[in-house]
Amino acid sequence: MRLIHAVLGLLAGAAPALVAASPAAPIGNGRDQVSKAVGRHFEIDGKVQYFAGTNCWWLGNLLNDFEVELAVSQIAETGYKVVRTWGFFGVNDPSNPGQPVYYQVLNESLYEGGLGINYGSNGIRRLDTVVSLAERYDIQLVLTFMNNWNDFGGINIYSNAFGSNATTWYTDKKSQRAYREYIKFIVNRYKGSSAIFAWELGNEPRCKGCDPSVIYNWAKSVSAYIKKLDKKHMVALGDEGWLCPPEGDGTYAYDCSEGVDFVKNLEIETLDYGTFHLYPESWGYNYSWGSEWVLQHDAIGKRFNKPVVFEEYGTPLNHTQLERPWQLTTVKETQVAADFIWQFGTVLPVEGTEWGDVNSIYYGTEEYEVLAVQHAWEMARKKVPRH
């Protein structure tokens, strides 16, 4: 057994093999203000305001500090206030990780309790750099704790380690213990940072064919756990906003088949705001329906007097033509508190466009000026209604 990584997630009474390393970059040197929900909006930077953000899942996946800083500086220059990025990168076998960066290892044969943390140069230090640079450039982060999908260590690595699957994961004791211990590690490491906007339970959690109570109970329990660790920062679910109306039209977004009920989950007191995503092409809808989806979630947010965030949206082609109407609906017709396009793209000196995808909006392009720069300006100048 090669104990290259420090041990986390140990059972009560067990002693860690190594002492947790301090952050590799300066953290905790930014402003004292903590973002919070105020009615249907957010107070950020000491002001209740609308704002735009972006997704950039790959920030911590870069091995070069200069490239991380380049991306963060361009995001800040755009006028974005918040970046949603992965707070996880996990593997089962550290001797053959299959990816350049990994923060966590799930393997019961290597670690008591099953969870190890990589403190090497391609481990948690990469996220330290992201958090430190976010502080320096005065932007905030939504850190997501797990992935419903298999990319870069999702539920699949828990399945490999503990025998759970995509639906039993939410109630599997070993999986949930390791998941909570990882949350505890991340929250305790960064809760003193001014760069944290919110903690997020997962990226697009689903439980296909399950009763919505499975996700609801899991989200209620885990969000309460996070609030015990950190009473200051917000917590979100990270779901796609699926709806379960009793008399729905039976189509995918309204049939509850993914086991997620956006309305029910918004009732959870320890979730500070709701999230919804939009990918009409993948879901079997026409693009014009997207604006209706935005309006529906805005109306639900009004009912609960909670912020809702249009947290992901994208198309594989004709970005400006297809996505701009959704942005204009958000700006002109709703009180959606913020929106985060999927996703920020740039050309990096070493990595190039390695981590982009067909939805990426690349810095410096004509479409970026419209969908990123102009939209961030529109959201920033939008007036918050007086109550």
Curated annotation (Swiss-Prot):
Glycoprotein in keyword set: yes
Signal peptide: 1-24
Enzyme Commission number(s): 3.2.1.78
Positions that bind substrate: 86, 203-206, 240, 279, 283, 342
Superkingdom per UniProt: Eukaryota
Keyword check for Hydrolase: yes
Catalytic reactions on record: Random hydrolysis of (1->4)-beta-D-mannosidic linkages in mannans, galactomannans and glucomannans
Biophysicochemical property: temperature dependence: Optimum temperature is 60 degrees Celsius.
Disulfide bonds listed in the record: 207-210
Catalytic EC class: hydrolase
Keywords in alphabetical order: Carbohydrate metabolism, Disulfide bond, Glycoprotein, Glycosidase, Hydrolase, Secreted, Signal
Pfam families, sorted: Cellulase
Activity across pH: Optimum pH is 6.
Glycosylation sites: 107, 165, 286, 318
Subcellular location: Secreted
Catalytic residues (UniProt): 204 (proton donor/acceptor), 312 (nucleophile)
GO BP terms in the entry: mannan catabolic process
Gene Ontology CC terms: extracellular region
GO molecular function: mannan endo-1,4-beta-mannosidase activity
Free-text function comment from the UniProt entry: Endo-1,4-mannanase that catalyzes the random hydrolysis of (1->4)-beta-D-mannosidic linkages in mannans and heteromannans. It is a crucial enzyme for depolymerization of seed galactomannans and wood galactoglucomannans. Active against locust bean gum and gum guar. Also has efficient transglycosylation activity. Produces mainly mannopentaose and mannoheptaose out of mannotetraose. May even prefer sugars as acceptors instead of water.
Family statement drawn from the similarity comment of this UniProt entry: Belongs to the glycosyl hydrolase 5 (cellulase A) family.
Protein name as annotated: Mannan endo-1,4-beta-mannosidase B
Higher taxonomy: Eukaryota, Fungi, Dikarya, Ascomycota, Pezizomycotina
Protein's gene: manB
